[in-house]
Amino acid sequence: MAPRVLPLPRQQSFNPPTVLNPFVHPGRLSAGDKLRIALQGIILLPLRAICITFILLLAWLSASIATFCQPGRGFLPLEGWRRRMIQTTLSSLTRTAYFVMGFQVKVKGKVASLPEAPIFVAAPHSSFFDGIICALTGMPSIVSRAENLSTPVFGTILRSLQPVAVSRQDPDSRKNTVAEITKRALSKGQWPQILIFPEGTCTNRSCLITFKQGAFLPGVPVQPVLLRYPNKLDTVTWTWQGYSFKELCIMTLCQIFTRLEVEFLPVHVPTEEEKSDPILFANRVRQIMANALNVPITDHTFEDCRLMISAGQLTLPMEAGLVEFTKISKKLNLKWNHVREQLDTFAAIASASKGGRIGIEEFAEYLKLPISDVLKELFLLFDRNGDGTIDFREYVIGLSILCNPANTEETIRMAFKKSIPSYSMDIALQSVCLVFFQALQIPGIAHRAAEC
């Protein structure tokens, strides 16, 4: 008999994402690709490297002059000749650098002025080459890690853009970053426009993941900016699983040309409802961009990347840690640390299986119970798609729903209502309650076992 998928509360809202892993780019080169890159690189790589080094030094010199003896360094906006120098000289040098690297940039749409849109939101963010948008938009401010400002050469160039610095050591960094973005966006033209990649991390461009709220909290008009790399051979995508920074740089410099399309969509002016609800504002802008790109949206976030890395450290497949953290955390009121702890338990159960999934055998072995009808019904409470295995996402959802005192008994009764005769209902319920209490350490089940 085929396994039945038992209805659980809110089951449809926990459907798996359209794109299972947007943080991986396996990109394998064929033997022909490797040979072609090697032959082209003999000439292109050294020539381009020399030219880029020269351009980089000129950019550093321009940035140094523009920020020399800058009044109110970091606290006041650059004005007058300093700002014009950044907008003209540094912008031209950046465009030249991309031209030397072989980029053929096609621009669609019109760039909004500062009064029209204080903030640019660009997506999908998939590469360090996405920085071309800075040159196309007049060198706006960006959001960057504070550590980047202290790097040689690049740090000086970065400081000239007056970035909003984010410090991982400062516990108040997120709050301060949001406050600084809001202050600049509402400055009525005193500060330059701000460029933000709202996804917060790089993906493989197969979807748009959750947008962070920073760009939308000020409640000002934003201009969506789309990025496309329509190349037969992808040498630009920089994800958590894939080619390294160094490998991508070398492969791209060895290409004769690399196509890049940048499209500026119409400015999105928030409604009063969106101004008071930044999540709604972000989701609507994301949907507009996804429609224009013809890609789906998912609820993945940077926190999923952290779980993915943790899964790899636990010898699980890295994609096992992807749970769409935004959706899971909101609907089940879970914190990242709690989900991370559950990953350890899941890894212990799945260690005997292949592929990072729990089968009925591993489930029974971990619970120290024989495979029985009661255990199979319990297993089906977790196996939401009925494929005979439990992945980490199903494990977190199932355990969280069944641990909820508001619906624990209701869920168990629902699972057994149509499969166990009424005269054995009480025994079955008590057995399952005891299984949860003894093996899964679910709080509040002990006294319920006697009541079932």
Predicted regions and their residues:
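Beta-strand cores of modular interaction/reader domains in eukaryotic scaffold and signaling proteins
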Residues: 44, 51, 104-106, 120-122, ...
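Eukaryotic intrinsically disordered and solvent-exposed regulatory patches
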Residues: 37, 105-109, 114-117, 126-130, ...
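Membrane-interface recognition of transmembrane alpha-helix starts
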Residues: 25-59
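Extended, low-complexity, polar regulatory segments
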Residues: 1-32, 306, 449
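Catalytic core of membrane glycerolipid acyltransferases/transacylases, capturing the structured
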Residues: 60-93, 98-104, 113-171
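Conserved, structured regulatory domains from eukaryotic proteins
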Residues: 85-89, 95, 145-186, 193-195, ...
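Primarily EF-hand calcium-binding motifs
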Residues: 327-366, 372-400, 409-424, 429, ...
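A cross-family acyltransferase "interaction/gating" segment
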Residues: 152-161, 190-193, 200, 204-280, ...
